[in-house]
Amino acid sequence: MSHIQSIFAQIRDPFRKLSFYSLPLSSETSSVDSNGLKNSLKDAYFGLEKALTNTDADLPLNLCDYIFFPIVPVLKSWYRVPSTGVEYAIQCVNLLYKHGWREAHNEMLTMQLLLMLLNIADGWKSPSETVEQDFRVREITFETLENVITDFKPNFHDKRQYLLFARALSSALDIIPNKNSSRRLQFASLCCVQKLICPKQYRLPTEFLTTFLPGIVSGLTKGLAPNGTCQYFKNVCISLNILGDTVVKAISDDNTKDLPDEKDASSNSHFFGPTKRTKSWKRATCQQLSNAVKAILHLRSSQNLHVQDALFDFCFILFRDCLDSLKDCRIHLLESMLKLINKKENPKLRDYGMNKLVSLIESFNNITMESVLTECLNDWSTTWSSVSTFASEDNKLEELNRLKSLLSISSHLPKTLQLMEPLLDGILSQLVPKSSGIDSNSQKLLTSSTSNEYIHGEFFGGNEMERTTQEIVTSFAKAPNVKYVMQSLLSKATSATNENSVRAFWAFMVLLKSDVETVDSLEMYIDSLEQYSFEVLQQLSQLNVFTKASLEDKQKKEKYNLLCVRSCIAIDSISWISSLQGVKFRSKLMAYFYPLLEHLAFASPYVSSFAEACIQAIATNCNYSTPAELLRENIDYVVNSVALKLNTLDVSPQLPIVMAYVIKNDDGGCIRYIGDVVDAIFGILDAYHGYARLTEGLLGILYAIIKQESINGEEKKLIVGVEEDAMNEDKNKPCKKIREFVQLLLENPNYPLPKDDHELEDMIHDEQQETKSGHEQFREHAMKEKEKKGKENENMGETTVDHENINSNVMDEQGEKQKDDVVDMVRKITEKAQLFLSHEQITIRVEMLKLLSYGSNVLAKEPNTFYPAINTFWPLVVIQLDTDNELLVECALETIYQVCALADDFMTSRIRQDLLPRLETLCQRWHLFNVARTYSSEHRLQRAMLKVTSACVANKLSIVVYLKLMGITAPIIRAITHMSQKYAGDESLVEETWNAFSKQNPDAVYYEREVRGSQMIDTFSTELLIPGKQRVQRTYRRTHEVLEPVGAKTSETVFNDLLGQQGSGKTETQEEPLPSLDNLLHLNQPKKGAKKPLISII
């Protein structure tokens, strides 16, 4: 069986059944079985679809006629058939056309099908009677019409075909603005319109397109209007494509440039002739099209990417081909394209759209484009004059973005930029200087360009308004008269300090940073920028007059923000100039380095971040590896600047921080310079000690020096410890002592091998020799061999010089000398600082106590200097505990803790006589045995007291002093333990304190933690009295401890009472659960060493 026979066999029965039910439709009077007809149409459609599913072959025309025969009555009398049946019938026609009639190109059949389908779509029962058609039937009908129209090639000179074309076009256009139309129906009708107007198989004559142009524009515009029905993105895109192609074909500049006047137009001989194309027709049509285009351009605010692409293509072809015809809307077309290009969500359009637009502008005549851009800029100026004052920020930003888009293409025609120069001041006035709310990360400020770095800062809030304005200012760099613009900005910037001058300063810097190509004397403007920036950097004193209280005033706060922004703009300019000059900028470091360090030390994080970024950029641009290397290479500049400030009594709040920064990054190499500065400070303090603010600033410098030197010493210890640990952890390398021992072996190969144990015992003659290790004996032997060798060389006159040892000795001597210089400088500073411990100003006394605390770390390296210093400042420090200022007391306790921890047993008598009575009084006055609030002054004093007592017990104290310290410490610990909200470091501090006391007397600590802390003071519990109960020393913290009341007995008294109770209530067989009093009283007695063996005595 052939393929066609197989299809026929499958569809024969369904279509035979359909013929039976559809034949009555041929007569108007015969009755129709609606259900049977509907079911037969359904079976026929599904049978045909099933038969044609797995085949690509076309149906023969005779088979198509056989199938179509029972469907024709349904199409003609569709109003007598249920809508579902009509739907199945039209779908059968669609299948027949796709698989058979499409290749036949039967003109008459195509026209008949079009007419029948249009009647069904429009609901025509007769030329005089219509009904509302079912929406589902209309959708299927227009989808079928789309396929049928593809084969329709009308002859417009044939009236019948002309009218059929007009009816099909009008029916499709009527559906687009209809509110009852679905998306599917709109899409199908738009596809029909597209195939009718823009066919691929033939060219629609322009004169006939002109006839239908008003209806096409009207129908599509109504659908695309803001309140139109065409909202689905696919429908919008196809509507824009149809409208663009239609307008370009009808009124393009090439098609309308030689139109005749009205009187010269020839009349048409056809009775249905096309519209006459004359100049008056062009004016009327272009006006209608301009209004339509303006109504459609609201789509540029759409967020759909497909709509944005379609609208850009629509505007582009109209701007390219109808620039002269659509003069009324070409400004709107250009602005719409620029707005679409600048949308962030469509980067693809931004890339290819700008390239197309720039290429188009370059291809046009300059005169024409200058005229267009001039119109655009004049229109923007008119709008901006009404918006800039009263409109919201969003509206202003929208207009500025519009201007930015226009200026982006105006750069290709620089003459048009002259129109915007008068409006530059108004544009800059929208910026408000802001120095707060901006990220203060210095690394984010830096911008790399090849091998150089410079700052790219934000000064007006870092918002979109600032970025847009910056791009607008940058576009003026290619203006012909940019020279005059820069002169105007520079004169405004150097005038009185106000918002306008700061904005002009910023705009002047932005213009210079951009590629200014039309200025001949560019170096002159760069020098002017550098000079003014340097003047601004030297005016930091204007910012130091503001205090925290003064910033509460709104006007003063605005002035402060203004000065901060101006300083940051100057710093930005200096970094950019250093990137231009590179290594040549090194010669200017003498002038710029110290002002930048002052700004680095300024209290505002905004200003200090700019200064830090600038120093980093200068270090990179001048070929320094790090800012620390930059400082070490130019340390003399900084110290000389500090000395100059001191000589003129110009002590700013930034001087101490600058000195701290210098010491931190110089690795101790600045000592030889700072010594002169310290001497100058001493002289000023002696002469002007009555000036509190000057004194505070100078003492702050000394405090910064001491603090940083102490921190540097601690960091060096840590670094050395880490290096040794790393060396010990390296399994592939021996430790330092073994390597030294191996080196000695290589230098002394003749050293005898060690003896065995018996031989060594015979060779021991005294106790001293017995105690020497083999390594020490070997070292002594090596030294003797070296001395012996040296004597032999002297006798022979052949003495040699060990250059390596000499160099190492010289370096050691230099290191020792530098260390002595540091200690001597710190000693002088501490001697001067202790004179101000009695100053009437609390802040100065607090700073001096901190200075002594840090200075003790340095002085402790030389006990011969440290102990006499303690004798001098100790009485002045201890007396601070009697004051009523909690901050002063806390700092005094911190200093005492530092001194006691470093001086060891040197402080024993002072602890007993001077410190202990004051600590007891301090606890009562400040109620330190009570539970305090977290972070309160009492809480801080409790923590400081624990540090002091833990440092005191490390000295050789008597048992009485020890128990008194325990009586102070234990209640404070219980108070801290029972706080509702604990400080993060409280637990570790408590454990450290218990461990410090436990090293001297673990029994006392056990009693305080286990007995008093468990509420067993009144009567012993049976658990403690059980025979065999052993005491276990605990080195960890208990979780259940009870606060001791303020009036409770001291630890010593209660402990002795409990010992008495124990002795009276125990039997001889019971073991003692508590420590004996003998252990406590013999706390400090040294243990007797083991007896030496007899052989050592011999």
From Swiss-Prot:
Annotated Gene Ontology cellular component terms: cytoplasm; cytosol; TTT Hsp90 cochaperone complex
Claim: GTP-binding is one of the keywords in the record: no
Keywords: Cytoplasm
InterPro entries on file: ARM-type_fold, TELO2-interacting_protein_1, Tti1, TTI1_rpt
Compartment annotation: Cytoplasm
Main location: cytoplasm
Transmembrane regions: none
One Pfam family matching this protein: TPR_TTI1_C
Gene Ontology BP term (one): 'de novo' cotranslational protein folding
SUPFAM superfamilies: ARM repeat
Chain positions covered by the region annotation Disordered: 768-795
Protein purpose: Component of the TORC1 and TORC2 complexes required for the regulation of the cellular respons to changes in available nutrients.
UniProt record similarity statement: Belongs to the tti1 family.
Assembly notes: Component of the TORC1 complex composed of at least mip1, orb5, tel2, toc1, toc89, tor2, tti1 and wat1. Component of the TORC2 complex composed of at least bit61, orb5, sin1, ste20, tel2, tor1, tti1 and wat1. Interacts with tel2.
UniProt name for this protein: TEL2-interacting protein 1
Organism: Schizosaccharomyces pombe (strain 972 / ATCC 24843) (Fission yeast)
Gene: tti1
